[in-house]
UniProtKB/Swiss-Prot annotation:
Subunit: Component of the DASH complex consisting of ASK1, DAD1, DAD2, DAD3, DAD4, DAM1, DUO1, HSK3, SPC19 and SPC34, with a stoichiometry of one copy of each subunit per complex. Multiple DASH complexes oligomerize to form a ring that encircles spindle microtubules and organizes the rod-like NDC80 complexes of the outer kinetochore. DASH complex oligomerization strengthens microtubule attachments. On cytoplasmic microtubules, DASH complexes appear to form patches instead of rings. Within the complex, DAM1 and DUO1 may form the microtubule connections.
Outcome recorded upon mutating residue 117 to T: In DUO1-2; produces abnormal spindles resulting in growth arrest at 37 degrees Celsius
Broad class of where this protein is predominantly found: nucleus
Modified residues (N-acetylserine): 2
Name used for this protein in its record: DASH complex subunit DUO1
Keyword Magnesium tagged: no
UniProt miscellaneous comment: Present with 996 molecules/cell in log phase SD medium.
Protein's cellular compartments: Nucleus; Cytoplasm, Cytoskeleton, Spindle pole; Chromosome, Centromere, Kinetochore
Signal peptide range: none
Effect the entry attributes to changing residue 67 to K: In DUO1-1; produces abnormal spindles resulting in growth arrest at 37 degrees Celsius
Recorded family membership: Belongs to the DASH complex DUO1 family.
Function field: Component of the DASH complex that connects microtubules with kinetochores and couples microtubule depolymerisation to chromosome movement; it is involved in retrieving kinetochores to the spindle poles before their re-orientation on the spindle in early mitosis and allows microtubule depolymerization to pull chromosomes apart and resist detachment during anaphase.
Length: 247
């Protein structure tokens, strides 16, 4: 076992053909030892068995040799394919890169065309733009020497002037608001009544808003009544109070 473990692949590759050759030579020697006989018997059986063994071994050996030749051809083909891929891979990568660049440029052009088409559709749906175009065409028909498109330029100048005027007004409003002094907290109060101007003063007690004298509010416990009040619990009630109680 130690000797077999020490054998490497190259040694095994060299020993396999030698083993097959020895087996073939031994088979030939065994077949030559037995003479051919015309009669039946053990010699005929031995020769038949030897012939079958020799044919089987020859078929197995031939098939192994053919497989070995096929493997050698396949190995050579794989080597050729690997070499071709190594040499042509950068070229293929460059071709793929160029195809991707051209595809991206086509897509960018299509996106630009689509955006411009959408912008033109939006302009053609705007009535103001159509009116300006019609005015310009009318002006060109009337004044053939007008090369600057004065109608369109005049409209644009007017729009710019309006925008500048609005900005100036906004800045003036902001300046006035910043320059205005802050009002004190008690400004706007009437010094006589201590209330804000524009509001009616609160009337004093006993005088209503229309100038009439109001009656003072008297609690119910202090209002006069016909029933006498008993201050002492042992005081005997009078006859008049009794009659009022049982009436």
């Amino acid at each position: 076992m130690s000797e077999q473990s020490q054998l490497d692949d190259s040694t095994i590759d060299k020993l396999i053909p030698q083993i097959f050759n020895e087996m073939r030579s031994n088979l030939n020697n065994t077949t030559n030892k037995f003479p051919k006989s015309t009669g039946g018997g053990a010699s005929d059986n031995i020769s038949a068995n030897s012939n079958s063994i020799r044919s089987f071994n020859s078929i197995t050996t031939q098939s192994l040799l053919k497989e070995s030749e096929s493997l050698d051809k396949i190995t050579a083909m794989i080597k050729n394919v690997t070499a071709a891929l190594k040499n042509n891979l950068p070229v293929y990568v460059n071709q793929v890169h160029e195809v991707c660049k051209s595809t991206n440029s086509i897509l960018d052009s299509w996106i630009n065309i689509h955006s411009q088409a959408g912008y033109i559709h939006k302009l053609m749906s705007d009535q103001t733009y159509l009116k300006l175009i019609n005015d310009r065409l009318h002006n060109e028909n009337v004044n053939t020497n007008d090369e600057d498109g004065s109608t369109l330029h005049n409209v644009i100048a007017l729009k710019k002037k309006e925008i500048l005027d609005l900005r100036q007004k906004l800045e003036n409003r902001k300046g006035e608001k910043d320059a205005a002094p802050a009002k004190p907290p008690n400004q706007g109060l009437n010094p006589r009544y201590g209330v804000q101007s524009g509001r009616r003063p609160v009337p004093s007690a006993g005088i209503s808003n229309n100038g009439r004298v109001r009656k003072t509010h008297v609690p119910a416990s202090k209002r006069p009544s016909g029933i006498p009040r008993v201050t002492n619990r042992w005081t005997k009630p009078t006859a008049s109070s009794s009659r009022k109680m049982f009436r």
